[in-house]
Structures are given as C-alpha cells and as structure tokens.
C-alpha cells in the first residue's frame, strides 16, 4: 500500500525533487519567450498526476482490448467531444503522444513510402516533420518544398506551380517560425487541383484558432494535426482532427499502427484543457496574446531590429539580429543570463549554421499567461534590445535581471 502523505517525491527522491524545485523557481523568475512554451493550469497538471496513469486501455472508447475501461472511456470521449466542438471538426483522435506522432499517423494512414509530399521548407519556417531530410518524413517520402517570396510571405504562386509539376499525394501546411496568417483556403484549392490531400499542422496556432483570432483550417483541410500544449495551453501531447470519412484509417494508424496503449492521464489533461479553451476567458487571453506580440514586435523595430515578414499577425515572430552584429546563439545566451528565455532560430536563407543562426524566435503566450499586458510587452521589448546592444556588459545584464525580477514578482505564474 502507498501512503499519500509519506510517498512524495521529496521523500522518495530528494535529488530529483531538488531539480524539480529549481525548475519551478526558474519558471517563476525568468520571462519565458520561447514561442512553443506556455504554462499549463493546475487542473491540467492534477489530471496528469491522477491514478489514470495506472490504466491500460488499448483501443478506443467502447472497443478496448482490456477490461475495466468503463471510466477511462468517459475520459477519452470527453476529450474527443470537446476538441471537436472547439474546432468544429467532424472527427478526432486524441491519442497521439505528440504533434510529431500525429503527423506520422496521417502519413502512415494515407501514404506509402516513396509517395510525394509537399511541405514548407524548414529553412523558411516549416517544421522537421514536414519533409526535412533528417526526419522520417524526409527519408520515407519524396519531398518537394515550398517557401517564402521576396516579401517573406508564403509564395502561393510558386507552391501552385510545384504542385502542378510534381503532383504530390499530400500537401502539408503549417509552420514553426512564420508570423503571418496562412491562407488555408488557397492551399486547399491547390491541393484539390492536383488531387492531393491537405494536412494542416496547426500546432503553433491552435490556441489562437480555438479563440477565433487566427484562421481556422478545419473547414478546408482533410486532416488537421496539432500539439495540445504551446498556445493551446494543455498537456504535452497531440491530436488529429479529420473529416468523418477518414476516421477509421486514422484510428487504425494510431492504434495499432504506430502506438500501443494510450496515455490516459494525459488524455484527461487534454480534456481539461479543451474545456478551459471553450471558455470566454480563453478567448480574451488569446486576444491579449496577439496584442502583446504586436507590441513586442513594434518595440523591437523601433529599437533597430528587423522582424522577418515585417510584422506578426499571430503570437510568434522571428527577429533578424544582423543589424546588431550578434548571432542567435550569442543572443540566446546573453538574454538567458538576463533571465529572458528565447531560442536561437534560423532566418530565411540564413548564412549561419543551424546551431549558430542569425535570428531568435520570440512568442507571447507564456508571458501573457502570467498576466503581462501591452505595457509589460513594451518593457520586455526594450529590455531585449538593451541586452542585444550590450550583450557582454555586466552592468547592463545586472540591471535587466533586476527589472525582470520586478516584473516576475508582480506577475507570478502560479499564485
């Protein structure tokens, strides 16, 4: 028998507990600007820490390979029904353990090795799983990549020409470092013109889409994949939304195709997050996410930095650092020393190596979760510029750390 009072992480594993506590402190004391990170709610974390972690449930609600699944069936069905309502989808699979596995599930269901797929180039803001040669998607399939035009918007004309020339079986839309709105309707027309499936990976934009502040791809795409964390603010995991006609092959592709028993405790966390995302408060939050990102970008431009694509229409922006004569790697380190967390990121046609880069990617979801508004977003933008202008100046870093401490103390993540 386990005693809940004594069988705590602190008692059982003090070394691990110390690392967890240090990470908790870091999250409270640093300003988080990595676009793919956010803070999930205590309710979501509680669901993940529940006894649901003990239950095996291979299969789907009402059709399991194990007994004793009557209550986890309720949990999974709640998640399915809520995510369908949230995005207006005909069908949903909530079992993928990640966004990458959601993408793999669609590929496994609808493609064969050697088929041609077309996705956004990683060098122009796409994602590894959209056909990068280092990823399974780039090794198993013949990949054609589209990218940005001279205005650093998606080159839809070139994408259409590529589709007509190569006749891909599946076109992937979505990005990991692209700040503008994506024309999903136009990409759907391109896909239809060549008889291709359209899969939209909305992992970065899902929270914004749920709140109606970014275009919804569901009416236009055959498949929509997403993570459940990032801007959606749920647990780490994935989801596939699809037209009803594809539900059976997608379900078979996830189980038994690429996964075994689903993580029922995480699916419970997803269900909680979807309920939270259906609330008016979540819509208001996402409106602030977009507003804060706009102010942050405008502040950086005023301080002499260039935003790739000229602006942001979402939560994310890619900052070209070349005007400040600093690499993304050096900027990430300097800002980290000032307790501002970002990630280095390649800009389009970046002359630097992938582990060096000429840019950083910034996002507003996490700082907005902790309560920052446009006033704080402007302050953060100026603090970033201060550091980038004097990345090795100890006095500047100390001053910025002090201002960060004042902000984070005023706006705790978990009160």
Curated annotation (Swiss-Prot):
Could you tell me the keywords of this UniProt record?
Answer: Amino-acid biosynthesis, Cytoplasm, One-carbon metabolism, Pyridoxal phosphate, Transferase
Q: GO: which molecular function terms?
A: glycine hydroxymethyltransferase activity; pyridoxal phosphate binding
Question: Which residues does the annotation say bind (6S)-5,6,7,8-tetrahydrofolate?
Answer: 122, 126-128
Superkingdom per UniProt: Bacteria
Instruction: Show the Gene3D superfamilies listed in the entry.
Output: Aspartate Aminotransferase, domain 1, Type I PLP-dependent aspartate aminotransferase-like (Major domain)
InterPro entries this protein is in? PyrdxlP-dep_Trfase, PyrdxlP-dep_Trfase_major, PyrdxlP-dep_Trfase_small, Ser_HO-MeTrfase, Ser_HO-MeTrfase-like, Ser_HO-MeTrfase_PLP_BS, SHMT-like_dom
Its main subcellular localisation, reduced to a broad class, is: cytoplasm
Q: Where is this site: Plays an important role in substrate specificity?
A: 229
What reaction gets catalysed by this protein?
(6R)-5,10-methylene-5,6,7,8-tetrahydrofolate + glycine + H2O = (6S)-5,6,7,8-tetrahydrofolate + L-serine
Q: Which residues carry this modification: N6-(pyridoxal phosphate)lysine?
A: 230
**Enzyme superclass (EC):** transferase
Biological process, per Gene Ontology: glycine biosynthetic process from serine; tetrahydrofolate interconversion
Q: In which pathway does it act?
A: One-carbon metabolism; tetrahydrofolate interconversion; Amino-acid biosynthesis; glycine biosynthesis; glycine from L-serine: step 1/1
What's the Enzyme Commission number for this chain? Answer: 2.1.2.1
A Pfam family assignment: SHMT
Q: Does the keyword Transferase apply?
A: yes
Would you name any one GO CC term? cytosol
Q: Which positions make up the signal peptide?
A: none
Compartments where found: Cytoplasm
Cross-referenced PANTHER family: SERINE HYDROXYMETHYLTRANSFERASE
HAMAP family recorded for this chain? SHMT
* Record text on subunit structure and interactions: Homodimer.
Record-linked NCBIfam families:
PRK00011.1
Q: What does this protein do?
A: Catalyzes the reversible interconversion of serine and glycine with tetrahydrofolate (THF) serving as the one-carbon carrier. This reaction serves as the major source of one-carbon groups required for the biosynthesis of purines, thymidylate, methionine, and other important biomolecules. Also exhibits THF-independent aldolase activity toward beta-hydroxyamino acids, producing glycine and aldehydes, via a retro-aldol mechanism.
Instruction: State the similarity comment.
Output: Belongs to the SHMT family.
- Know the name of this protein? Serine hydroxymethyltransferase 2
What gene name does this entry carry?
glyA2
């Amino acid at each position: 028998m386990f005693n809940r009072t004594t069988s705590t992480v602190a008692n059982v594993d003090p070394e691990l507990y110390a690392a967890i506590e240090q990470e908790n402190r870091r999250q409270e004391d640093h300003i988080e600007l990595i676009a793919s990170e956010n803070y999930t709610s205590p309710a979501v974390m509680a669901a993940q820490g529940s006894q649901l972690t003990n239950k095996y449930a291979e299969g789907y609600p009402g059709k399991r390979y194990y007994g004793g699944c009557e209550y986890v069936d309720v949990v999974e069905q709640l998640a399915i029904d809520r995510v369908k309502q949230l995005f207006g989808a005909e069908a949903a699979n909530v079992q993928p353990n990640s966004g990458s596995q959601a993408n793999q599930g669609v590929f496994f269901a609808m493609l064969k090795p050697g088929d041609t797929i077309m996705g956004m180039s990683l060098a122009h803001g796409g994602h590894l799983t959209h056909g990068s040669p280092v990823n399974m998607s780039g090794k198993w399939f013949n990949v054609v990549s589209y990218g940005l035009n001279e205005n650093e918007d998606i080159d839809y004309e070139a994408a259409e020409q590529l589709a007509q020339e190569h006749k891909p079986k599946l076109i992937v839309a979505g990005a990991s470092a692209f700040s503008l709105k994506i024309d999903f309707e136009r990409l759907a027309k391109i896909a239809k013109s060549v008889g291709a499936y359209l899969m939209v990976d909305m992992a970065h934009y899902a929270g914004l889409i749920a709140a109606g502040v970014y275009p919804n791809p569901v009416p236009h795409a055959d498949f929509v994949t997403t993570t459940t964390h990032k801007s959606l603010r749920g647990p780490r995991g994935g989801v596939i939304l699809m037209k009803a006609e594809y539900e059976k092959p997608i379900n078979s592709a996830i189980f038994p195709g690429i996964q075994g028993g689903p993580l029922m405790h995480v699916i419970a966390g997803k269900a909680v997050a979807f309920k939270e995302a259906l609330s008016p408060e979540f819509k208001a939050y996402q409106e602030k996410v977009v507003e804060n990102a706009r102010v942050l970008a405008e502040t950086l431009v005023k301080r002499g930095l260039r935003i790739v694509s000229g602006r942001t229409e979402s939560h994310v922006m890619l900052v070209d650092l070349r005007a400040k004569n600093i690499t993304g790697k050096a900027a990430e380190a300097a800002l980290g020393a000032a307790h501002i967390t970002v990630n280095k990121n390649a800009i389009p046609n970046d002359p630097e190596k992938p582990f060096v880069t000429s840019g950083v990617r910034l996002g507003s979801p996490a700082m907005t979760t902790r309560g920052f508004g446009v006033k704080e977003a402007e302050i953060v933008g100026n603090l970033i510029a201060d550091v980038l202008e004097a990345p090795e100046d100890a006095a500047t870093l100390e001053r910025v750390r002090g201002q960060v401490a004042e902000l984070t103390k005023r706006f705790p993540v978990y009160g």
